[in-house]
Amino acid sequence: MLTEYTAPGESVEVGDDESIYSLLTGRIARTGEDTVIAERKTAPGQWMKVITGEFHKDVIAAAKGLIAFGIAKGNAVTIFSTTRYEWGVLDFALAAIGAVNVPIYDTDSAAQAERILNDSDVKLAIADNRERFDRLDSVIDRCPSLKHILMLDSNAMGALEGLGVTVSDEELEARIDSVHADDLATIVYTSGSTGAPKGAELSHRNFISITRAGSLALHEIILEDHPRLLLFLPLAHCFARFIQYASIASDDGVVGYLPDTKTLLPDLRSFEPTYLLGVPRVFEKVYNAASRKAGMGWKGRLFLKAAEAARDWSHMQQAGEKPTMKQTAEHLSYEASVYRTVRGALGPRIRYVACGGAPLDVSLAHFFNGIGLPMIQGYGMTETAAPFAANRVTDNVIGTVGQPAPGSSVRISDDGELQVKGPNVFRGYHNLPEKTAEAFTEDGWLKTGDLASIDDEGRITITGRKKDIIITAGGKNVSPIPMEQEIVKCPIVEHAVVVGDNRPFIGALVTLDLEGLAAWLPSVGLSADTPLDRIATVAAVHDEIQKYVDKANATVSRAESVRKFVVLDTQFTQENKCLTPSLKVVRPAVNRVFAQVIDQQLYSGKR
């Protein structure tokens, strides 16, 4: 095992005068304006092609409109929307004029949006629909810098185009020329260990470097054989921003923008992507849907046997072994009866799936690999403009997250933490110099907070998390502390521990406060000496705690909210290692001691 590794090859070149907008103009310079660059859904099963020239025209119109709106270089503009064509256009328009894109997740609450708007001094916010417009409008009086809110569903793009006619081509060109690679391009907010959101400042160079390096490392997926990407991850996530840029920057890549994932499976069939980018939960749902469709009878038994055979086939491939004639015949049989159908659910032209944003179940990766659909796992974080390392198509070692991009470096600290260095590493947290200093070592390496190992070929294996931040199976970063603090305000609660790492939703374990119970129980007709194991099952107890869970949930998005909690009939103590001598909760110990409760009562039946 290695303690430090630098990927061979030079870091990709990024000119000092380049911007994210240059990715688009570079494509036009190479291939002209007549190649299809995007598709937007117009009706069920119907997609409208957008050629590069039309996309560029829309970007220019939006850029001029933003200038006319008074957006100066360095001003912050928020996009509060699901993934849609206009999001992509606005992203490139903001980059072109040197404005700072401050995205807000479409699921964020009004309170979360307010914190982001004020911390980054947003001048203009653009929401997609009435619901999100109203969330912004409800806090505008408490956001001094926010002057205007536009709504895409009320023709915001048309309004920008109309305003932009007053801006000359020369004025626009002067703005474009004023933007440089090291200028701030975006502030992306991510949960911190204290619960307060931290705005990661990412430059144009950060994104351009990883876009080019990632495209070269994954050229079979992103650059070759007429690549088609259906983009449904939120563009507020750096992972999605990166892959959008990679598709736009390729010679003939096509990105389809999907605003609503409720119709994902039929949209996959009609759009026909060649590759997909998703978080583990997406592919878990595909697997679970196939399993449910097979049912409980003989078809269900066939699916389970085929799934196990696929994993065995993948393990055999990974070990470099050759199948026997019997194994080959079995594989061909399952290919005809099961594997082809599962792959077809992702579209008839699918060739690869890329996965990141949260830890991936190795058995799931082996399943997809075994059915002939290589799953490429990567690793990154907001602070690295999403991807930092990825498996290669020709070196896809399941269980690892691959090697870093060419010219980038990784190392393992004395306490096992993965630390990284490269041109896509962010410059710091907005308005938080102390947090920025804490994020880096004295010699300039970014501390990831993840525990890892590096093999002799430079492949990284993530072995755990050093920090408390929870990453759900859907890739959402959740800080548990603010939620826990709200729940323990309940007078009958002693401790609350939020869980959900690599799980489909956020849950919580709750212990009861004996003194608080003694005072409260008579109010619901129970004796103060009622046994704890009975109290834990009383509906009135759950109802009382639910009030505080609801209060906690009101401050966060649905993806971060506690969907289910379990009242324990025991307490955290120093004896069971769940409390320190200073009576602090030991989170890993709680997860270990109550693992069966978490698995069977919180997440029973869930993958």
Residue ranges and their predicted role:
Residues E33-T35, M151, V165-Y189, A196, ...:
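Conserved pre-ATP/AMP-binding loop-to-beta segment of ANL
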Residues K49-G53, A185-T211:
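Conserved AMP-binding A3 loop
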Residues N75, D108-S138, I210-L230, T261-Y275, ...:
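Conserved ATP-dependent adenylate/AMP-binding module captured primarily in the ANL superfamily
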Residues P404-T472:
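Conserved ATP-binding/catalytic segment of the ANL
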